[in-house]
């Protein structure tokens, strides 16, 4: 089958990465369709609907490239599957990663299903990751070539079934090259800055945004031995290892968040970047997903490396099944500020094996006060 007989539906955000993704596929001769996903009804601080601006960029890019385009509304799916989860996690005192859930439930589920209904053979996105397809049909996901932009961390929950229908055309080139291609082609998004902030919601003031949905309950900020250091403005606004925004003055080392007590509405703080309370030996994680589950013997356990947050260096770990629903991940050496609600993502070299969501953190067999 030649490329012109293969239909690829590209998820287009109005950014440079998805624009170049569509261009590359078109150049390779595929039957390309661009789809803009509208997942949040939003305006920026100036009252401008950012989704409309982004969609206008998608229209212009698709016209430049010469491909058809559509907009699809996934607001209900996003609210039900991602945003509700996001709020529930904050209510539990955890720090969720909505991008992980957004990829699992929206970009590579709702969008993937929609694309298949359009007769797509594959979907493509502008993620910095790579797919390796074996002769027997199974696939592996590899880190993007641009180490600084690799996004496999956020894709860790994707299954073999999902990834077998996915293309990441820019995963094997550097970000600077993506910009160069966009400029060379005169794409309107060539100089558009990268989006940051919450998946699909953008760069809002996080505290203001969250307070619209969850009532804040101020409370005491104390040390682990009970010394009162001030007031916090609501546990949901703080994460483990956080330094800024505590408002604790005085001499000596900076202060850091080392735990939360939801029952008493207390935020625990201690002084010093390397305070002992910030370090742990192992974690328990649930909602685990592996790209090739049969390759990993969870009963015997296996060694690999892991990341506990985006753009963190890999750490050597040992992964073993804890029970029917959870994994125990033991670190080769203590790790600082592991955060319940975040993803732990597993690697063998460049291959992303999968990941899980961190529940509890332990030191010397005792659970830490990270979230109690």
Curated annotation (Swiss-Prot):
Native species: Staphylococcus aureus (strain bovine RF122 / ET3-1)
Principal location: cytoplasm
Disulfide bonds: 102-199
EC primary class: transferase
Binding site for ATP: 11-18, 37, 126
EC number: 2.8.1.13
Protein name (Swiss-Prot/TrEMBL): tRNA-specific 2-thiouridylase MnmA
Keyword Transport: no
């Amino acid at each position: 089958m030649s490329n012109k007989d293969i239909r690829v539906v590209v998820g287009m955000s109005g950014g440079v990465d998805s624009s170049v993704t569509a261009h590359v596929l078109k150049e390779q001769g595929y039957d390309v369709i661009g789809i803009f996903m509208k997942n949040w009804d939003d305006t920026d601080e100036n009252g401008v609907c950012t989704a409309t601006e982004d969609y206008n960029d998608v229209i212009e890019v698709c016209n430049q490239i010469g491909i058809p385009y559509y907009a699809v509304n996934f607001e209900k799916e996003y609210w039900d599957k991602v945003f509700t989860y996001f709020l529930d996690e904050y209510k539990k005192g955890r720090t969720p990663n909505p991008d992980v859930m957004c990829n699992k439930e929206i970009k590579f589920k709702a969008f993937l299903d929609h694309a298949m209904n359009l007769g797509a053979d594959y979907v493509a996105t502008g993620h910095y990751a790579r797919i390796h397809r074996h002769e027997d049909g199974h696939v592996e996901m590899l880190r993007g070539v641009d180490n600084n932009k690799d996004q496999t961390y956020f894709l860790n929950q994707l299954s073999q079934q999902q990834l077998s229908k996915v293309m990441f055309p820019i995963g094997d080139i550097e970000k600077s090259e993506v910009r160069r291609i966009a400029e060379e082609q005169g794409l309107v998004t060539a100089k558009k800055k990268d989006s940051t902030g919450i998946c699909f919601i953008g760069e809002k003031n996080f505290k203001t945004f969250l307070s619209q949905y969850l009532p804040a309950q101020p409370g005491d900020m104390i040390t682990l031995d009970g010394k009162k250091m001030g007031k916090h403005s609501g546990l949901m606004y703080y994460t483990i290892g956080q330094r800024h925004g505590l408002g604790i003055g005085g001499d000596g080392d900076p202060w850091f968040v080392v735990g939360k007590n939801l029952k008493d509405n207390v935020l625990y703080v201690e002084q010093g970047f390397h305070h002992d309370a910030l370090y742990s030996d192992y974690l328990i994680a649930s909602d685990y997903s592996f790209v090739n589950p049969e390759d990993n013997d969870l009963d015997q356990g296996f060694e690999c490396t892991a990341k506990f947050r985006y753009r963190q260096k890999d750490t050597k770990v040992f992964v073993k099944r804890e029970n029917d629903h959870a994994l125990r991940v033991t670190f080769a050496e203590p790790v600082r500020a592991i955060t319940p609600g975040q993803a732990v993502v597993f690697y063998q070299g460049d291959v992303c094996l999968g990941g899980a969501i961190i529940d509890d953190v332990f030191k010397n067999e005792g659970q830490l006060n990270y979230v109690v």
